[in-house]
Amino acid sequence: MEYSAIYHDMDKRFCYAIDKDLFVIRVQVKKDDMKEIILHCEDKYIPMERKDTKKTILMKKIATSQFHDYYEAQLHMHLICLRYYFEFTDTQGEKIYYGNYEFYKECITNRDRMFDCPQNLREEEMFEVPDWAANKVVYQIFPARFAASQQVDKEQWYKAPISSMDDLHGDLRGIIEHLDHVQNLGIDVLYMTPIFKSYSSHKYDIIDYYQIDPSFGTTEDLRELVQEAHKRGMKIVMDAVFNHTGREFFAFEDIMEKGEKSKYLDWYYIEKFPLESERGEIPNYKCFGYYGGMPKLNLKNPEVEKFFTDVACYWIKECDIDGWRMDVGDEISHYFWKNFRRAVKAVKKDMLIIGEIWHYAGDFLEGDEWDTVMNYPFYLNMIDLLADEKIHVSQFVQNLGYLKGRLNKKCYPLMWNLIDSHDTARFLHLCNGNKKKQHLAAAFQLLLPGMPMIYYGDEFAMPGANDPDCRRGMYWDEEYQDKEMYEWYKQLLWIRKKHACISEGELIGSITKDEEETIVLIRKNVEETIALIFNCSSNAKNFSEYEGKYNLLRDEPFDGKVEGLDAAVIVL
């Protein structure tokens, strides 16, 4: 038994409430080390001689990463405080007990040697997420390039490669006019990158947080967009750029004008005067990524915190938006995010808060900051598996298992699974134009649990290299559209919505074969059992054990074969 691999903490990731009187307790162990894990629990305060409150629960393996297995027990309890410990039996028959961060050879009888779970505390800190969000489908729009309400010359609109200086006249009215496309695709949530006043096309260097950029439209246009989306059953998420501003933002302008005498000096991180931000040089004030045009805000300053929290609340009240995506969220303090969550949830309880972070985000996802994140670990694993072919299918599944094993159960169905975005090259570009690879990547994205985030144009196989070329004009003319890819996305989304088992069903089987480069995931709910088959090789593979069953993706009986870089959804 590998003692050093055993990990449990009485925190919001390994011991927490998911509902009134319903709790989750998890433990991490070495991969393939354990034959059985039993959770022992009892009431902390009721003496044994008065009442025997002991219970035992056989824990269930819920995820496997590259080096660890994760076990979980769910238990109903109605008491003041629970005491608990673990009984491990490894594959060699060795037995050990673990309580209060110590190992014991004998069963633990002293309650002071056990772990602690105070019920009220855990329930008061329970992770509450919007009821509407789990497993919904997101569509990301870059407003400057998605759709224009005015006529734009075709040569200008479809320019490739495109630069950050190209103006395609995209606007909110253009988005409104194309909502039917988004709805018909099967989208639940529309996420827009920033739309506030700025001189750039990307709008991440904001000048005025209370004004829609005139090139995009007006507050009334935004209000109409939200209303029209809501009529179609869609939610609207906007981009919150609170890590930094543009240089022309009033507070930084005041600093540039008045220097050390500016009353806004403490709104930023100024190292010395005069301010210097020569191209190619590191500015003498903190910025986003050393870009002098994006000075970093000091959100520890109560005035700054209040200003930007007020901005977030204002747009919720003014236009009834449904979520904020937090740009560069991991470079802003936990203190700010805790206060931010309380403020916006007080205005609209079912607001969705999404953080931008490119790695594991467990410390932001404990129920008191964000609801979810853009799942860049998913993106990176899709690149490694399909685009670069650097990992085998077993490692892909294990890497996703790390997230499932360590994240709160409430947020896992809300993870924004993406294969590209406005900050990356298009997936098709990373695959050197291999559409079959994007075809399979879309199947992974849309058939796994979470909130898949489709970047505008992926449904038409839009190409595009790294930023800014990944932000080309949307393919609205049929001559540019890949209709086969579009129908594939529609079919995947239709199946996902019609068969809740695909995204919400319990995973009861996972078969990965590295030599074949195939994955079979079997999910089950009260209505049906479904096998999701992914063939990551370039050659056809046989799955004769499912022959004759119905293949939802092809809408016909399964012939037992899955072509190279293809998928199947089989009703068992």
Model-inferred region functions:
Residues 136, 142-188, 195-318, 340-346, ...:
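Substrate-binding/active-site clefts of carbohydrate-active enzymes
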Residues 27, 141, 182, 192, ...:
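Conserved, mostly hydrophobic/aromatic
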Residues 144, 366-368, 372, 413-435, ...:
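Aromatic/acidic polysaccharide-binding cleft in carbohydrate-active enzymes
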Residues 226-234, 249-259, 317, 327-410, ...:
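Active-site-proximal helices and loops of the catalytic beta/alpha 8
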Residues 31, 82, 558-572:
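C-terminal beta-strand-rich structural cap/linker in extracellular carbohydrate-active enzymes
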Residues 137-139, 190-192, 236-238, 324, ...:
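Hydrophobic faces of well-ordered beta-strands that scaffold small-molecule active sites
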Residues 1-24, 49-138, 148-163, 167:
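The feature marks proteins involved in alpha-glucan
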Residues 24-26, 510-546:
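Carbohydrate-binding surface patches
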